[in-house]
Amino acid sequence: MPQQKMRIHGQYVKDLSFENPNSPFLSSSKAPDINVMVNINSAKLEGTKNKEEVNEEKSFHEITLHIEVKATVKDEGIKDGVAFICETKYCGIFSIENLKELSEEEVRQALFIGGPTFLFPFAREIIARVTSSGGFPPLMLDPIDFETMYEQQGQQQKSNGSNSNFN
């Protein structure tokens, strides 16, 4: 297997939202229930060449790590129970070199395992800071095993048809 070279050329917050709808009326002393949803998207950037074109051996991709966190509490005074909702789309611009030598599966693994693994600590820090600024303890998300997530999504997509996004 050829060694793939994946480089990051930039990273940034594409979207960030924090909702604290029941403040200052939230009085629950219990820890909220935390629901985390993760979605990964990869988009080939315009102006980069396809794998089949021989004069180009690398391609550029924007990888988006979309994380949505919803914290709920059981509090009679709060009708919907929402403590907060935090959502971020954290992106990186990556290039993959040696493209002609890589299989399609190796490229997908770089995009949906390597890219998100690099981006996650930065997105995690942003979520911790935003929840802290919202008046809650900093939310430190547990590490995510993107390889296992990739494998699980691959199994689901084989039965449902293919897609370039992973949830």
Swiss-Prot record:
Q: Which GO terms describe its cellular component?
A: cytoplasm
Q: Does the keyword Ion transport apply?
A: no
The listed locations are:
Cytoplasm
Q: Which UniProt keywords apply?
A: Chaperone, Cytoplasm, Protein transport, Translocation, Transport
Name any one GO molecular function.
Answer: unfolded protein binding
InterPro entries linked to this entry: SecB (IPR003708), SecB-like_sf (IPR035958)
Question: Which SUPFAM superfamilies has this protein been placed in?
Answer: SecB-like
Q: One GO biological process from the UniProt record?
A: protein folding
UniProt-listed PANTHER family: PROTEIN-EXPORT PROTEIN SECB, PTHR36918
Name the protein family.
Answer: Belongs to the SecB family.
Assembly behavior: Homotetramer, a dimer of dimers. One homotetramer interacts with 1 SecA dimer.
What this protein is reported to do is described as:
One of the proteins required for the normal export of preproteins out of the cell cytoplasm. It is a molecular chaperone that binds to a subset of precursor proteins, maintaining them in a translocation-competent state. It also specifically binds to its receptor SecA.
What name is this protein filed under? Protein-export protein SecB
Q: Which organism is it from?
A: Wolbachia sp. subsp. Drosophila simulans (strain wRi)
Native organism taxonomy: Bacteria, Pseudomonadati, Pseudomonadota, Alphaproteobacteria, Rickettsiales
